[in-house]
Regions:
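Predominantly extracellular beta-rich ligand-binding scaffolds that present long acidic/polar faces
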Residues: 1-115
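A broadly tuned, weak detector of single residues within folded domains
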Residues: 72, 120, 174-175
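Generic short alpha-helical hydrophobic face used as a protein-protein interaction/packing hotspot
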Residues: 83, 131-132, 185
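C-terminal accessory segments
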Residues: 95-156
Length: 187
């Protein structure tokens, strides 16, 4: 699951989840990957606004604001929390994990931004360059600005065709047809 804005939550403790990757997402609801048979799940560079339950995986470069943080047999590195969520305290001060951050300090906020754009980082916050260095690259924490980061409104940085006008029919024997194509640059 990559570059999604998720409002309905993910997971179920009844199902075994193996080799899942959740990267560069914004979660406004719960993440429940608490089946004890889960294995090798990667949760990296996300923004979480609700509870997290994760068994057997890797959790890094995330920004969390939730009521509970429950992990078992999970490597927890370079995450930031808004306030001090229950269960996150044992990880604070180790492997780059920090707590007691605030939305106002980390994020741009809703004013002048879209629903998903409000979670972009403010310059100079601990989340900027706060991710785990891999292959000589130190990403930001959160969903944006990581390698292959979250894309606002899901629109990639490539030209988009937003209108196409084609005649319903052309006269028999006509060698050409006029078509109108409208594009927009999303860079």
């Amino acid at each position: 699951v990559n570059k999604c804005y998720i409002t309905g939550g993910i997971g179920n403790s009844s199902f075994v989840m193996q080799d899942w990757e959740l990267r560069n997402n914004i979660f406004t609801s719960n993440l429940d990957m608490s089946n004890t048979s889960n294995s090798n799940n990667l949760v990296r560079n996300n923004v979480f606004r609700s509870s997290i339950n994760l068994y057997n995986g890797y959790f890094a470069n995330n920004i969390i604001q939730n009521t509970t943080f429950t992990v078992v047999n999970v490597t927890v590195k370079n995450n930031l929390s808004i306030g001090a969520p229950a269960g996150f305290t044992p990880y604070v001060g180790t492997f780059g994990n920090l707590n007691n951050q605030t939305d106002a300090v980390l994020f741009q906020g809703l004013t002048g931004n879209s629903t998903d754009g409000q979670w972009r980082l403010k310059p100079g916050t601990p989340a900027v360059g706060g991710g785990l260095t891999v292959g000589g690259i130190t990403p930001d924490c959160g969903a944006f600005n990581a390698q292959d980061g979250y894309v606002l409104s899901g629109i990639p940085n490539i030209p988009t065709i937003y209108e196409l006008t084609v005649p319903a029919s052309i006269p028999a024997g006509t060698a050409t047809m006029n078509v109108t194509l409208s594009t927009r640059n999303n860079n």
